[in-house]
Every structure is written in C-alpha cells, then in structure tokens.
Amino acid sequence: EMLRSLVGSEMCIRDRTEKAINAIQKSDIIVGYNTYIALIKDRIADKEIVGNGMRQEVDRCQKAVDLAVEGHKVAVISSGDPGVYGMAGLVLELIQKIPEEKRPKCEIIPGLTAANTAAAALGAPLMHDYAVISLSDLMTPWEQIQKRASLAAEGDFVIAIYNPKSRGRTTYLDQIRNIVLQFRKPGTPVGIVRKAGRPGMNWTISTLEKLPEEDVDMQSTVIIGNSNSYIADGHIITPRGYKL
C-alpha cells in the first residue's frame, strides 16, 4: 500500500498542488500536526484523522508508518514542502527500520515552501544564490546555526530565515542580524512575511539596520538580501546579472 507524505496544508486551497489534493482524496487516513490538519479540514471531512501536537513528530510519523504497514493508504501532512524542514526525512528514516519485505512504498509530493511564497510577496529577492537557515535550536546547536549564518553572509548569499523567533528565542534574530552586518551594508534590504500563503498574510520591507523585530514572530519568514539587492517600487529585487 502507498504511504504518502505530502504538503500544502498551510496554503489556501487554490495554492495546493493538484497532486497533493489527489493524494489526500485517495488516502484512507490523514496523519499530521493538529494545526495543519485544521487548515485542510475542507478536504478531509470523510477521512480518519490521526493528529497530535508540537514536538511529537516521531510519534506521529511512526503511527503513519505503522498504519501503512497494516495496509492503509496514509497521507502525512506537512506545512510548505515535506522535504524542507518537513516530515519526509523522518518518515523515510522510520521506514528503513522495517524489514525490507514489509516496507511500505512512500511517495514524497512536493509543495510550496515558505521561502518561495514569501519571496513572491516581496518581489524577486531569491533571483540569485541563497541559503535557507532555521533559527530553531531544538535539534541544531545554536553555535552551529550562528556559524552557518556567518558563512552564508560571508559568501554573499541571500538568506531566508525560518523560525526567527519564539517565546523562548527572543534574541536570536538580533544576533543573526549582527553577524550579517559584519559582511553587509546597513541598508541591505530585508523582508518580513507573516503567515506566508495563509489567510491574513502580510509583509514589511525594511533594511538590515532598521529591521523591525516587533513585526517578527514564530509565523514569520525573514529574507535578507545580498550585496546587490535593492528596493524599488515596494519590491526587493536581487539582480541575476543580466546586462540591461
């Protein structure tokens, strides 16, 4: 039977991929984080639901794998893209622990990650090389996150930041800004997008020096331009290098 890991739960229905919608419709059981399941309730009224809360990812994915082994068609819901800070990797790791002859098939269905949705709202900030960095230190040491941010800034990558702030991480974004300021001008464009792709999405365009941290929360995606990025007509533009 097919164990499906898919995405799009955080998007408005028009933004979900057709393949993801079809996978949901063909599944017997939907497994996911309660918040994400609520976002697709219009599509799963007739499905069996297995949901749980934050920091229960292993239990959630193990349940999905167990159900698939039993013969059910299971859809595991991730926000954005399942392969970008989502559940795809965990599901595949758990499947590898099952004897080969009993392993369920798994199809990873791509979706629209927050960096891309945020970039579209801001204009064209990701037109050149970029790095995506999460500031969550639940599974990655803060020192390693800082090192990655420093190297990305030194390499002049556009930087997309996930999980920039939470109740327990109120200063991390400011620390990253100070790291990037060692390599970028204070006027470097910065975009903050809240609820990317969801109802109520809004965004702010500012600069690295004046980054309005009061506009940032755990539902925000922050994009910091590179040395060539600029602001024009309410957009952040990162030139690709075309001769104009």
List each language-model region with its residue ranges.
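Class I S-adenosyl-L-methionine
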Residues: 10, 14-106, 212
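Class I SAM-dependent methyltransferase SAM-binding "motif I" and its flanking Rossmann-like core
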Residues: 18, 86-155
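Single conserved hydrophobic/aromatic residue that forms the stacking wall/gate
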Residues: 1-8, 12-13
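Short beta-strand segments
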Residues: 8, 76-79, 109, 133-136, ...
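A polyampholytic, Gly/Pro-enriched intrinsically disordered region
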Residues: 72-78, 124-135, 154-155, 209-218
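A contiguous loop/helix-start segment that scaffolds small-molecule binding in enzyme catalytic cores
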Residues: 154-244
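Gly/Ser/Thr-rich loops at beta-strand to alpha-helix junctions
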Residues: 80-85, 112-114, 166-167
